[in-house]
Design a protein with these regions (language model features):
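A general structural motif
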Residues: 2-4, 37, 61, 102, ...
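Conserved acidic, metal-coordinating active-site core of Asp-based
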Residues: 97, 101, 108-228
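Asp-based phosphoryl-transfer active-site loop
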Residues: 3-20, 94, 238
Length: 283
């Protein structure tokens, strides 16, 4: 196996534990890897403004694949080195339909996230950890009319997220209706980032495509890459990477796609994987 030169790490459920924190063991091991010349990037469904920039840069992480692969940014400068955005008219057409449902939704534009005032009451209905709730409330820029805002800015939309209230027994409010809307548009692809949501990007855009761009940009061959993840939006990234690592807490789909299953996100599984595949430990 080729020497690993680039590692892409999912954040929620992978790098972050259930308390939304990076363990000291993970921090130390990532920093050790970057000091040894390995490039480490986060690969997330989050926008740039939702990233803990100082924390990530402090352990040597300098790139962020955001919006499920729709944009790649340098940290801490927020320089966008790659973007593959949704068509504005298409997004507006979909949002006009989604707005008729009892859901929460927002859009990602140039590393920031915007939501309409009308969905404020739905934030607390979303089934997600307290830390993520707080992040959503603090990071979103509120506008009166989101469709009108998107049209007037004239800037491409990196990703759109739609969250559902969880009713129990696997049922989410208006998810089936939303799915029926999204299924009418072959120009997009959607998946879940966890927390009972759909996230859609332009068709063909994934964390895997973002990883391929970043590897090419920094001169790393794909057979020198490793990726760690836990949920559906990590699937294509694991498929593209030479070494695909599933967290111990990962979904069955991700575990089946992986070359190796590490410890859980509450057990510093990222550190264990880096120690194994970069430093040759745990043989």
């Amino acid at each position: 196996m080729s020497e690993i030169k680039l590692i892409a790490l999912d954040m929620d459920g992978t790098l972050f534990n259930e308390n939304g924190e990076i363990s000291e063991k993970d921090k130390e091991t990532i920093k050790r890897a970057t000091e040894a010349g390995v490039a480490v990037a986060v690969a997330t469904g989050r926008s740039y403004v939702e990233l803990p920039i100082d924390l990530l840069c402090g352990i040597g992480i300098r790139y962020a694949i955001t919006g499920n692969g729709s944009a790649v940014y340098k940290m801490p400068t927020m320089e966008c080195v790659f973007s593959d955005c949704l068509d504005i008219d298409l997004v507006c057409e979909i949002l006009e339909e989604v707005a008729k449902l009892d859901v929460y939704y927002d859009v990602y534009i140039e590393g920031r996230v915007y939501r309409p005032e009308s969905v404020t009451h739905n934030i607390r209905k979303m089934d997600m950890p307290t830390a993520v709730h707080e992040l959503v409330e603090q990071s979103r820029i509120v506008v009166d009319d989101l469709v009108d805002f998107v049209r007037k800015t004239g800037k491409g939309v990196e990703k759109t997220t739609i969250n559902f209230a969880y009713l129990g027994n696997g049922v989410c409010k208006d998810r089936d209706k939303t799915t029926a809307i999204l299924d009418r548009y072959p120009q997009i692809q959607y998946l879940t980032g966890g927390f009972h949501n759909w996230e859609f990007t332009r068709a063909g855009v994934t964390k895997g495509s973002g990883l391929k761009f970043l590897a090419e940009r920094i001169g790393v061959a794909m057979d020198q890459t490793m990726a760690c993840g836990d949920s559906q939006n990590d699937f294509y990234m694991l498929e593209e990477a030479q070494v695909a690592v599933a967290m111990g807490n990962a979904s069955a789909q991700i575990k089946e796609a992986a070359d190796f299953i590490t410890l859980s996100n509450n057990e510093s599984g990222v550190a264990y994987a880096i120690e194994k595949f970069v430093f040759g430990m745990h043989e």
